[in-house]
Protein backbone atom coordinates (compact mmCIF):
# COMPACT_ATOMS: atom_id res chain seq x y z
CA UNK A 1 0.00 0.00 0.00
CA UNK A 2 1.41 3.43 -1.02
CA UNK A 3 1.34 6.03 1.74
CA UNK A 4 1.61 9.79 1.27
CA UNK A 5 3.55 9.83 4.57
CA UNK A 6 5.78 6.93 3.49
CA UNK A 7 9.55 7.47 3.39
CA UNK A 8 11.79 5.46 1.12
CA UNK A 9 14.50 3.58 3.00
CA UNK A 10 17.21 4.40 0.45
CA UNK A 11 17.53 8.14 0.69
CA UNK A 12 18.82 9.12 -2.75
CA UNK A 13 16.57 12.11 -3.36
CA UNK A 14 14.73 13.14 -6.50
CA UNK A 15 15.54 16.32 -8.45
CA UNK A 16 13.08 18.40 -6.43
CA UNK A 17 14.67 17.44 -3.12
CA UNK A 18 18.17 17.97 -4.49
CA UNK A 19 17.22 21.47 -5.68
CA UNK A 20 16.13 22.36 -2.13
CA UNK A 21 19.23 20.98 -0.42
CA UNK A 22 21.17 23.68 1.46
CA UNK A 23 24.92 23.76 0.89
CA UNK A 24 25.91 25.49 4.14
CA UNK A 25 25.10 24.95 7.81
CA UNK A 26 23.68 28.47 8.08
CA UNK A 27 21.00 27.57 5.52
CA UNK A 28 20.16 24.22 7.11
CA UNK A 29 17.04 24.39 9.29
CA UNK A 30 16.93 22.26 12.46
CA UNK A 31 19.37 19.90 14.21
CA UNK A 32 21.02 22.89 15.92
CA UNK A 33 23.34 20.99 18.30
CA UNK A 34 24.60 18.73 15.54
CA UNK A 35 25.27 21.71 13.27
CA UNK A 36 27.15 23.59 15.98
CA UNK A 37 29.37 20.62 16.83
CA UNK A 38 30.09 19.74 13.21
CA UNK A 39 30.95 23.35 12.44
CA UNK A 40 33.60 23.31 15.20
CA UNK A 41 35.03 19.94 14.13
CA UNK A 42 35.22 20.96 10.47
CA UNK A 43 36.93 24.26 11.23
CA UNK A 44 39.44 22.46 13.47
CA UNK A 45 40.17 19.82 10.82
CA UNK A 46 40.69 22.49 8.15
CA UNK A 47 42.97 24.45 10.47
CA UNK A 48 45.14 21.35 10.92
CA UNK A 49 44.89 20.58 7.20
CA UNK A 50 43.45 17.14 8.03
CA UNK A 51 40.48 15.08 6.96
CA UNK A 52 37.44 15.20 9.19
CA UNK A 53 37.07 12.13 11.40
CA UNK A 54 34.60 9.49 10.20
CA UNK A 55 30.98 10.39 11.01
CA UNK A 56 27.93 8.22 11.75
CA UNK A 57 24.42 9.67 11.43
CA UNK A 58 21.48 7.66 12.71
CA UNK A 59 17.79 8.17 13.32
CA UNK A 60 14.46 7.75 11.51
CA UNK A 61 14.43 8.23 7.71
CA UNK A 62 13.86 11.60 6.10
CA UNK A 63 15.49 13.79 8.77
CA UNK A 64 18.45 15.07 6.74
CA UNK A 65 21.32 12.60 7.05
CA UNK A 66 22.17 12.78 3.34
CA UNK A 67 21.88 16.56 3.31
CA UNK A 68 24.28 16.90 6.23
CA UNK A 69 26.78 14.68 4.42
CA UNK A 70 26.67 17.00 1.40
CA UNK A 71 27.10 20.06 3.62
CA UNK A 72 30.14 18.48 5.30
CA UNK A 73 31.75 17.85 1.92
CA UNK A 74 30.98 21.38 0.78
CA UNK A 75 32.29 22.97 3.98
CA UNK A 76 35.47 20.88 3.72
CA UNK A 77 35.83 21.87 0.07
CA UNK A 78 35.98 18.28 -1.19
CA UNK A 79 33.97 15.94 -3.41
CA UNK A 80 31.42 13.44 -2.12
CA UNK A 81 30.92 9.93 -3.47
CA UNK A 82 27.64 8.22 -2.62
CA UNK A 83 26.60 4.60 -2.36
CA UNK A 84 24.40 2.32 -0.26
CA UNK A 85 25.38 -0.82 1.62
CA UNK A 86 23.13 -3.15 -0.45
CA UNK A 87 25.10 -2.12 -3.55
CA UNK A 88 28.38 -3.34 -2.03
CA UNK A 89 28.03 -7.09 -2.48
CA UNK A 90 31.69 -8.16 -2.73
CA UNK A 91 34.94 -6.94 -1.22
CA UNK A 92 35.98 -6.04 -4.76
CA UNK A 93 33.05 -3.61 -4.99
CA UNK A 94 34.29 -1.76 -1.92
CA UNK A 95 37.90 -1.88 -3.10
CA UNK A 96 36.89 -0.27 -6.40
CA UNK A 97 35.10 2.54 -4.58
CA UNK A 98 37.96 3.20 -2.15
CA UNK A 99 40.73 3.17 -4.74
CA UNK A 100 38.87 5.74 -6.84
CA UNK A 101 38.66 8.28 -4.01
CA UNK A 102 40.78 11.42 -4.12
CA UNK A 103 42.66 12.87 -1.15
CA UNK A 104 40.19 14.31 1.38
CA UNK A 105 37.03 13.01 -0.36
CA UNK A 106 33.88 12.15 1.55
CA UNK A 107 32.46 8.65 1.05
CA UNK A 108 28.79 8.40 2.04
CA UNK A 109 27.37 4.92 2.68
CA UNK A 110 23.62 4.79 3.28
CA UNK A 111 22.04 1.91 5.21
CA UNK A 112 25.49 1.10 6.55
CA UNK A 113 24.02 -1.42 9.01
CA UNK A 114 23.45 -3.72 6.02
CA UNK A 115 27.14 -4.21 5.25
CA UNK A 116 28.13 -7.87 5.46
CA UNK A 117 30.80 -8.96 7.99
CA UNK A 118 33.17 -9.74 5.11
CA UNK A 119 32.82 -6.21 3.73
CA UNK A 120 33.31 -4.74 7.20
CA UNK A 121 36.61 -6.61 7.54
CA UNK A 122 37.85 -4.87 4.40
CA UNK A 123 36.60 -1.52 5.67
CA UNK A 124 38.34 -1.61 9.08
CA UNK A 125 41.95 -1.04 7.90
CA UNK A 126 40.67 1.46 5.34
CA UNK A 127 39.05 3.53 8.09
CA UNK A 128 41.90 3.21 10.60
CA UNK A 129 45.06 3.20 8.50
CA UNK A 130 43.80 4.25 5.04
CA UNK A 131 44.99 0.92 3.70
CA UNK A 132 43.46 -1.96 1.79
CA UNK A 133 44.46 -5.49 2.72
CA UNK A 134 43.83 -7.71 -0.29
CA UNK A 135 44.13 -11.47 0.25
CA UNK A 136 45.27 -13.40 -2.82
CA UNK A 137 44.92 -17.17 -2.87
CA UNK A 138 43.69 -19.39 -0.07
CA UNK A 139 44.99 -21.72 2.58
CA UNK A 140 48.70 -21.80 3.48
CA UNK A 141 49.64 -20.21 0.16
CA UNK A 142 47.46 -17.13 0.71
CA UNK A 143 49.21 -13.78 0.59
CA UNK A 144 48.13 -10.34 1.78
CA UNK A 145 48.86 -7.34 -0.41
CA UNK A 146 48.64 -3.92 1.22
CA UNK A 147 47.48 -0.98 -0.90
CA UNK A 148 47.72 2.57 0.42
CA UNK A 149 44.59 4.69 0.08
CA UNK A 150 44.16 8.47 0.01
CA UNK A 151 42.95 9.88 3.31
CA UNK A 152 39.16 10.22 3.27
CA UNK A 153 36.15 10.76 5.51
CA UNK A 154 33.55 8.00 5.73
CA UNK A 155 30.04 9.15 6.57
CA UNK A 156 27.67 6.34 7.43
CA UNK A 157 23.90 6.72 7.69
CA UNK A 158 21.45 4.29 9.22
CA UNK A 159 17.94 4.05 10.59
CA UNK A 160 18.97 1.08 12.74
CA UNK A 161 22.02 1.96 14.81
CA UNK A 162 21.52 -1.11 16.99
CA UNK A 163 22.29 -3.37 14.03
CA UNK A 164 25.73 -1.86 13.44
CA UNK A 165 28.46 -4.13 14.77
CA UNK A 166 30.47 -2.79 17.72
CA UNK A 167 33.82 -2.96 15.86
CA UNK A 168 32.44 -0.86 13.01
CA UNK A 169 30.76 1.67 15.27
CA UNK A 170 33.93 2.08 17.34
CA UNK A 171 35.81 3.22 14.24
CA UNK A 172 33.67 6.33 13.80
CA UNK A 173 35.22 9.39 15.42
CA UNK A 174 31.81 10.92 16.06
CA UNK A 175 28.19 9.84 15.90
CA UNK A 176 25.02 11.90 15.92
CA UNK A 177 21.37 10.98 16.39
CA UNK A 178 19.09 13.19 14.30
CA UNK A 179 15.98 14.41 16.12
CA UNK A 180 12.45 14.98 14.85
CA UNK A 181 11.71 18.54 13.75
CA UNK A 182 9.42 21.09 15.39
CA UNK A 183 6.36 22.42 13.58
CA UNK A 184 8.03 25.84 13.43
CA UNK A 185 11.12 24.41 11.71
CA UNK A 186 9.04 22.43 9.23
CA UNK A 187 6.87 25.46 8.48
CA UNK A 188 10.00 27.42 7.50
CA UNK A 189 11.13 24.53 5.29
CA UNK A 190 7.71 24.46 3.58
CA UNK A 191 7.80 28.24 3.03
CA UNK A 192 11.23 28.05 1.37
CA UNK A 193 10.23 25.05 -0.75
CA UNK A 194 6.96 26.60 -1.92
CA UNK A 195 8.81 29.73 -3.06
CA UNK A 196 11.17 27.55 -5.11
CA UNK A 197 8.11 25.88 -6.62
CA UNK A 198 6.85 29.30 -7.70
CA UNK A 199 3.87 29.11 -5.38
CA UNK A 200 3.25 31.37 -2.39
CA UNK A 201 2.17 29.51 0.73
CA UNK A 202 0.09 31.18 3.42
CA UNK A 203 1.74 31.06 6.87
CA UNK A 204 -1.15 29.15 8.38
CA UNK A 205 -1.11 26.76 5.42
CA UNK A 206 2.60 26.00 5.86
CA UNK A 207 2.03 25.42 9.57
CA UNK A 208 -0.89 23.09 8.80
CA UNK A 209 1.31 21.05 6.46
CA UNK A 210 4.08 21.04 9.07
CA UNK A 211 1.80 19.74 11.82
CA UNK A 212 0.71 16.81 9.65
CA UNK A 213 4.20 15.88 8.44
CA UNK A 214 5.18 13.49 11.23
CA UNK A 215 7.95 15.92 12.26
CA UNK A 216 9.86 14.90 9.11
CA UNK A 217 11.08 17.28 6.35
CA UNK A 218 10.87 14.73 3.54
CA UNK A 219 7.20 14.11 4.31
CA UNK A 220 6.53 17.87 4.54
CA UNK A 221 7.99 18.34 1.05
CA UNK A 222 6.01 15.42 -0.31
CA UNK A 223 2.76 16.82 1.12
CA UNK A 224 3.56 20.31 -0.18
CA UNK A 225 3.88 19.02 -3.74
CA UNK A 226 0.46 17.40 -3.54
CA UNK A 227 -1.18 20.46 -1.94
CA UNK A 228 0.29 22.56 -4.75
CA UNK A 229 -1.65 20.32 -7.17
CA UNK A 230 -4.92 21.09 -5.36
CA UNK A 231 -4.17 24.84 -5.56
CA UNK A 232 -3.25 24.73 -9.25
CA UNK A 233 -6.34 22.76 -10.25
CA UNK A 234 -8.37 25.55 -8.62
CA UNK A 235 -6.31 28.27 -10.39
CA UNK A 236 -4.96 29.62 -7.11
CA UNK A 237 -1.53 31.27 -7.00
CA UNK A 238 -1.45 31.24 -3.20
CA UNK A 239 -1.85 28.06 -1.13
CA UNK A 240 -4.43 29.07 1.46
CA UNK A 241 -5.00 27.51 4.86
CA UNK A 242 -8.37 26.17 3.77
CA UNK A 243 -6.94 24.67 0.58
CA UNK A 244 -4.14 23.03 2.58
CA UNK A 245 -6.63 21.48 5.01
CA UNK A 246 -8.84 20.32 2.18
CA UNK A 247 -5.93 18.70 0.37
CA UNK A 248 -4.50 17.05 3.47
CA UNK A 249 -7.89 15.63 4.40
CA UNK A 250 -8.33 14.33 0.85
CA UNK A 251 -4.93 12.64 1.13
CA UNK A 252 -6.11 10.88 4.28
CA UNK A 253 -3.62 12.58 6.61
CA UNK A 254 -5.31 13.67 9.83
CA UNK A 255 -4.44 16.53 12.18
CA UNK A 256 -1.93 14.33 14.03
CA UNK A 257 -0.13 13.33 10.85
CA UNK A 258 -1.63 9.82 10.97
CA UNK A 259 -2.79 8.04 7.84
CA UNK A 260 -4.81 4.85 7.43
CA UNK A 261 -1.81 2.63 8.18
CA UNK A 262 -1.08 4.41 11.47
CA UNK A 263 -4.72 4.14 12.51
CA UNK A 264 -4.75 0.42 11.68
CA UNK A 265 -1.57 -0.06 13.70
CA UNK A 266 -3.06 1.71 16.73
CA UNK A 267 -6.37 -0.14 16.38
CA UNK A 268 -4.52 -3.45 16.54
CA UNK A 269 -2.79 -2.44 19.77
CA UNK A 270 -5.94 -1.00 21.32
CA UNK A 271 -7.86 -4.17 20.52
CA UNK A 272 -5.24 -6.04 22.56
CA UNK A 273 -6.35 -4.00 25.60
CA UNK A 274 -2.86 -3.35 26.97
CA UNK A 275 -1.63 -6.88 26.31
CA UNK A 276 1.84 -6.63 24.70
CA UNK A 277 2.05 -7.60 21.04
CA UNK A 278 5.20 -8.75 19.25
CA UNK A 279 6.59 -7.01 16.19
CA UNK A 280 6.07 -10.04 13.94
CA UNK A 281 2.40 -10.29 14.96
CA UNK A 282 1.78 -6.61 14.26
CA UNK A 283 3.59 -6.77 10.91
CA UNK A 284 1.53 -9.79 9.85
CA UNK A 285 -1.71 -8.04 10.79
CA UNK A 286 -0.69 -5.00 8.73
CA UNK A 287 0.63 -7.10 5.82
CA UNK A 288 3.91 -5.18 6.11
CA UNK A 289 7.46 -6.35 6.69
CA UNK A 290 8.91 -5.93 10.18
CA UNK A 291 11.55 -3.45 9.02
CA UNK A 292 8.92 -1.05 7.67
CA UNK A 293 6.90 -1.24 10.88
CA UNK A 294 9.95 -0.69 13.08
CA UNK A 295 11.73 1.95 10.98
CA UNK A 296 8.89 3.90 9.38
CA UNK A 297 5.64 3.54 11.35
CA UNK A 298 6.77 3.22 14.96
CA UNK A 299 9.37 6.00 15.51
CA UNK A 300 6.87 8.85 15.27
CA UNK A 301 4.28 7.03 17.38
CA UNK A 302 6.91 6.28 20.02
CA UNK A 303 8.32 9.81 20.05
CA UNK A 304 4.84 11.25 20.59
CA UNK A 305 3.84 8.80 23.31
CA UNK A 306 1.12 6.87 21.47
CA UNK A 307 2.77 3.49 21.97
CA UNK A 308 5.17 1.94 24.45
CA UNK A 309 7.76 -0.78 24.02
CA UNK A 310 8.09 -3.30 26.82
CA UNK A 311 10.22 -6.41 27.24
CA UNK A 312 7.21 -8.46 26.08
CA UNK A 313 6.16 -6.31 23.12
CA UNK A 314 4.26 -3.18 22.09
CA UNK A 315 1.26 -1.70 23.89
CA UNK A 316 -0.99 1.28 23.24
CA UNK A 317 -0.36 4.07 25.75
CA UNK A 318 -2.95 5.80 27.91
CA UNK A 319 -2.53 8.84 25.64
CA UNK A 320 -3.51 6.70 22.65
CA UNK A 321 -6.75 5.52 24.27
CA UNK A 322 -7.56 9.08 25.40
CA UNK A 323 -6.86 10.58 21.96
CA UNK A 324 -9.25 8.17 20.26
CA UNK A 325 -11.73 8.36 23.14
CA UNK A 326 -11.53 4.62 23.70
CA UNK A 327 -12.11 2.96 27.05
CA UNK A 328 -9.93 -0.06 27.68
CA UNK A 329 -12.78 -2.13 29.08
CA UNK A 330 -15.32 -1.58 26.29
CA UNK A 331 -16.52 -4.74 24.57
CA UNK A 332 -18.43 -3.57 21.51
CA UNK A 333 -15.75 -1.85 19.47
CA UNK A 334 -13.09 0.76 19.37
CA UNK A 335 -14.60 3.92 17.93
CA UNK A 336 -18.07 4.22 19.35
Curated annotation (Swiss-Prot):
ATP binds at residues 20-21, 62, 65-67, 128-130, 171, 181, 218. Residues 255-336 are annotated as: Head domain (RuvB-H). It catalyses: ATP + H2O = ADP + phosphate + H(+). Pfam families: AAA_lid_4, RuvB_C, RuvB_N. DNA binds at residues 309, 314. Residues 182-252 are annotated as: Small ATPAse domain (RuvB-S). CDD domains: AAA (cd00009). Its EC number is 3.6.4.-. GO terms for molecular function: ATP binding; ATP hydrolysis activity; four-way junction DNA binding; four-way junction helicase activity. InterPro entries: AAA+_ATPase, AAA_lid_4, DNA_helicase_Holl-junc_RuvB, P-loop_NTPase, RuvB-like_N, RuvB_C, WH-like_DNA-bd_sf, WH_DNA-bd_sf. The keyword Cytoplasm applies. GO terms for biological process: DNA recombination; DNA repair. The RuvA-RuvB-RuvC complex processes Holliday junction (HJ) DNA during genetic recombination and DNA repair, while the RuvA-RuvB complex plays an important role in the rescue of blocked DNA replication forks via replication fork reversal (RFR). RuvA specifically binds to HJ cruciform DNA, conferring on it an open structure. The RuvB hexamer acts as an ATP-dependent pump, pulling dsDNA into and through the RuvAB complex. RuvB forms 2 homohexamers on either side of HJ DNA bound by 1 or 2 RuvA tetramers; 4 subunits per hexamer contact DNA at a time. Has 3 domains, the large (RuvB-L) and small ATPase (RuvB-S) domains and the C-terminal head (RuvB-H) domain. The head domain binds DNA, while the ATPase domains jointly bind ATP, ADP or are empty depending on the state of the subunit in the translocation cycle. During a single DNA translocation step the structure of each domain remains the same, but their relative positions change. PANTHER family: HOLLIDAY JUNCTION BRANCH MIGRATION COMPLEX SUBUNIT RUVB, PTHR42848. This is Holliday junction branch migration complex subunit RuvB. The gene is ruvB.
Amino acid sequence: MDRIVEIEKVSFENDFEVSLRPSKFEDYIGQEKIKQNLDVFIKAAKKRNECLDHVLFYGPPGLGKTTLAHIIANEMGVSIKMTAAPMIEKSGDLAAILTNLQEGDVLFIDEIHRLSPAIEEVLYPAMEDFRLDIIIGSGPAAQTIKIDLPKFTLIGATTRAGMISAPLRDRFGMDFRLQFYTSSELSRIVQIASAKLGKECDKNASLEIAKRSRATPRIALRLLKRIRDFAEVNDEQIISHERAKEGLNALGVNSLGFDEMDIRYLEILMQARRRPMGLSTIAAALSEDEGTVEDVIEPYLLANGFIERTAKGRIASAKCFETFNVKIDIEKGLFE
